[in-house]
Amino acid sequence: MKTIAGLSWISALSSLASLPNGLGVSAQNNTPSTWPLHDNGLSDVVQWDHYSFKVNGKRLFVFSGEIHYWRIPVYEVWEDLLEKIKAAGFTAFAFYGNWAYHSANNKTLDFESGAHDFSKLFEIAHRVGLYVITRPGPYVNAEANAGGFPLWLTTGAYGKLRDDDPRYLQALDPYFSKFSELTSKHLVTNGGNALVYQIENEYGEQWKDRTKKIPNDAAGRYMQALEDSARANGIEIPLIHNDPNMNTKSWSKDYAPGAVGNVDVAGLDSYPSCWSCNLAECTGTNGKYVAYQVVNYYDHFKEVSPTQPSFFPEFQGGSYNPWGGPEGGCPGDIGADFANLFYRNLISQRVTAVSLYMMFGGTNWGAIAAPVTATSYDYSSPISENREIGAKFYETKNLAMFTRVADDLTVTDRLGSSSSYTTNPAVTASELRNPITKAAFYVTIHSVSSSSTTESFKLHISTSVGNLTIPQHSGSIVLNGHQSKIISTDFAMGNKTLTYSTAEILTYALIDSSPVVVLSTDVGGSVEFHVKGATKGSLASSGFTSNATFRAEAGGVTTNIERVTGMGVYQFNNGVKVVLADKPTAYLFWAPNLSNDPFAPVDQSVLIQGPYLVRGAALDGDVVALKGDVKNSTTIEVFAHETALTLSWNGKKLETSRTPYGSLKAQISAFNGTIPLPSLNDWKVNEGLPEKMPEYDDNGAAWVVANHTTTPNPTKPDTLPVLYVDEYGFHNSFHLFRGYFEGSATGAQLSVQGGLAFGWSAWLNGDLVGSWLGNTTLGVGNMTLSFANATVHANGTNVLLIAQDNTGHDLRGGATDPRGILRATLDGADFTSWKIAGEAGGENIQLDPVRGPLAEGGLTAERLGWHLSGFSDCDWASASPSTGFSGADIKFYRTTFPLDIPEDVDASFAFILNATGPKTVRVQLFVNGYQYARFNPYVGNEVKFPIPPGILNYAGDNVIGLSVWAQGNDGAKVDVEFVQEYAVESSWSSRFDSEYLRPEWTEERLAYA
């Protein structure tokens, strides 16, 4: 082995003294003892310092990802998601609460019905083995309706929101207290898995003037009130917060010692490639968009939170797709390459706690969404909306698996970052070194991070056997396009050491006390690694096109492989086993743990290659019992304890053989059956807008007289009465306004507000007089209507009906922006009265607590329950939405079909909608009572709508409803297709008893005609 003395090419290290054990450079003077070790004064179970979090005295690399239980309201599916997150090597997951989902009115909280019982997340987390980052709000943003505020809060009657206004604090107290109380039963301090608890969300309001550090006292009192409430309701774990960007610098005890409202650990949110597919939304925060341009966070954390871990409660996991965005989202610059480059870049900046937003996005079903986004909340996440995993998941997994076993990564100092570490100025490396063990991690990246060139280089490193330039003997390290690589040195594997490897470390396990380490590199790449303490090495198995060369040198064995394809196994006489895999092979490498410890102890891990997904492993005598998913029949190879003789897969024993190097092999078969899909032919139809006719009777329970002449809303209407729907207890989606006037009028002026992409139509005495078709950049639709082509009763009563499609309440300070009519005037007459209808029962009567307060709007079909099973459509006419109808109207179509999905299969299905007639239509798709699609082709491009199991009945009948609103007189035609997304043989069966999620129609609906 060649060594190089006097590393003149690392100027940052030139003045550092020699270290023990032959290391040529020293870490900076900082050591863990230099930095204060913090706890919150209530418990020392969770501690933290400059380097990382500690749990029960052990340092933890927090690799987490966000899911939203309220965007996937089926708790059986939560287990599928958390098993996938665990399988990806994560140590934690995060979730937001949603106050609106739990609170229909200011007297009601529901944490029990259906998926409202979020405590099941903690139970699954404990079983699977994940810590939990709990984020209750009360405001969460999340592109959710009103940012997660309950919609009854948006009227203005509760004062200034997100402030210390006593009306607001009193309103939030029941929710926040109960959420804290329920979480307190699952804290890591009492044997649960809740690790930290977030106060508010992206509330960077600590300063009136940050440069002068003039505090915003009201914001401080608000934060302190939330913190006091959390503590009073049993939250003993650390309190955290997430700054929205690097400018606000709020709530850190390091930055503002002693300030009111500070939290225990301050974090930062960042979306360097934009949180939206519309890049223009981010230029104000991020500046001009440059694909793959990384951001300097290192200096921010040094300034704002130097005695705390560098922590991202949110780091970009994808982007949401706004109205008008591309079908399927925008994965182009935020796919697998993004995950590779940006997440390793965080490592280079000493980040030891990160949660990806989102890991699984889910769906904006019902009225979940804010106006900024449509039905899909796929977010281009590692786990797709239909729960499928692919390259981005695998790329993220490969890094997370490494961080879970790289104990030395939790205590590092950054010694330098420059191109001087490499032999190619186009490549920069950052050196992180553990000041105790002297292990190091060199994170390599293009010097211009946005570069997509292929660059070969060698790397100057400092190790326990001297200063080296690697690879020493042949080949080079290569960055292929948008790529970063972490080169580890003096990597501890139990009591053995991998001195260095030019391939990345994927994971390792101690099998019968001996390390098996898995390395990964690009297909066709060359690799060099040095195993310390060995004197001989041998090739045990190889699918490679070139053989290995072994050299005994410098207290170990250096191994060179010229070209890597597939997987090879190398054995060394000190007990170390090295598995070398190319990237596609490494994508299908797994390390399930035999315990449910989130730390995943390496002596209880099993290493597995082959399947699409491995969800878990257990030892049952001499059987390694594996569970997971398989897409294609494949060979499975397992590195497990020598007492294991046989493999089983999803409960079935496999014909197993042992390789000469000790692993177990078997064949597993995939699901090769077919799932017959129903034809959607037998539709029935009914009139969906009887309210447009003047003879319609609006004296029933569905209607409220709109007679308010004042409003607490800060936005005052231009005309009276007040026609804001929230004033009258209606909040969701579809609303109706009936305005009466006597005698002649020639037209009307209307200003209607409903959020971005919303629409409205107006009928006079049953005749269409105008439609606002929607605009992706406007939340207000102003129109002058002419009555020239309508029937006006000059000597009688006239009725103007306005149907409004509300796309949700705005975010942040816009939550109180009203929904409804801002101005309504007539030419030649005056309105004499108004009535408003919305969801059946309004906010005060909950007809469907299981689906919850955001499930329905005010369509006739919704109020009367036509979308529910148990409703009889026997007297409806037969007609298909693909045939359609003429004229401006709303029709409701209904059909039923069965599904019979096999046991032990995870299958996913979606509906595809296509407007074959005019695009000026607004369509809602209902599946077993859940609105799971808003299809608005005039303003949006989304056409495919995945439906999760549980919402779909996989073992029986499914009721499908389709509301079709033609906004023009040329009518509408809509094709509906039901497709299979995938079907895999799985230990997690998508067929389960979900009847509890689908309460049926009841007669009380009849009152809301």
From Swiss-Prot:
Family annotation (Pfam families): BetaGal_ABD2, BetaGal_dom2, BetaGal_dom3, Glyco_hydro_35
Binding site for substrate: Y96, N141, A142, E143, N201, Y271, Y379
One cellular-component annotation, GO: extracellular region
Gene Ontology MF, one: beta-galactosidase activity
Residues bearing glycans: N106, N467, N495, N547, N593, N632, N672, N707, N775, N782, N789, N795, N914
Single Gene Ontology BP annotation: polysaccharide catabolic process
Signal peptide feature range: 1-27
Listed EC numbers: 3.2.1.23
SMART domains in the cross-refs: BetaGal_dom2 (SM01029)
Predominant cellular place of this UniProt entry's protein: secreted
List of catalytic residues: E202 (proton donor), E314 (nucleophile)
Residue pairs linked by disulfide bridges in the UniProt entry: C277-C330
Function text: Cleaves beta-linked terminal galactosyl residues from gangliosides, glycoproteins, and glycosaminoglycans.
Family membership: Belongs to the glycosyl hydrolase 35 family.
PANTHER family: BETA-GALACTOSIDASE RELATED
The protein, known as: Probable beta-galactosidase B
Naturally occurring in which organism (per UniProt): Pyrenophora tritici-repentis (strain Pt-1C-BFP) (Wheat tan spot fungus)
